[in-house]
Amino acid sequence: MTILSEIVDYKEQLLKDGYYHDKLQNLKGVKHKNKSRLTDALIKNDNLTLIAEIKSKSPSVKAFQQTNIIKQVSDYERYGANAISVLTDERYFGGSFERLQQISETTQLPVLCKDFIIDPLQIDVAQKAGASIILLIVNILTDEKLRQLYQYASSKGLEVLVEVHDGIELQRAYQLNPQIIGVNNRDLKSFNTDVKHTNQILKCKKENYLYISESGIHSQQEVKQIVKSGIDGLLVGGALMNCNELEHFIPSLKLKKVKQ
């Protein structure tokens, strides 16, 4: 069993146990007034759009540098991040919907609920906790379920980041005609990363979509390796969580876009 399939089994069990129903009942809810949209930033910015991530741990990293989460988000915003990504999985990533709610209340930036969504109820909880964007991972969903969840989230006014890991998944994503497609540089079996994965997958990309490179980005040099693939943005997590010089590091990642 891969780590990913283990996580999905865990989500299915949480659904059966009423975890998400309880969250929906108990979260106080966050209003979305004046939130900017990720799509607008991706389209309008001449430089790469940055989604800066908050997480405490991952299956490949036992713990990231301890920090005041609200200050971290404030620093992300101050130094040029365009959106915030929040891991809400508790067991594997040390996140929570309460953290998502807290962050959503303190920033005007769009907020991505980064989780392993397999049911509409999870989308309801994410939105109530303040998310304006949700993640759908093509690898863990059938075409029918992917379309159902995409349409459901869109009908609720949420933006959707559709994540792919290979060329076959990219073609499946195109069937939705989504605005935003994320290319994850992480190998789902080993959880190792290689940023050149973005270049390989986007060799066969279609125009008129917005592309984000996700995971494994630790330096400007790595961004230089992938910017020519035609990406519009980056999602960076671990490197930001462990960084003590965000005022320099964040601007260094936001290179000028290269459109083909």
Curated annotation (Swiss-Prot):
The keyword Amino-acid biosynthesis applies. Its EC number is 4.1.1.48. Pathway: Amino-acid biosynthesis; L-tryptophan biosynthesis; L-tryptophan from chorismate: step 4/5. Pfam families: IGPS. One of its GO terms (biological process) is L-tryptophan biosynthetic process. Disulfide bonds: none annotated. PROSITE patterns: IGPS. This is Indole-3-glycerol phosphate synthase.
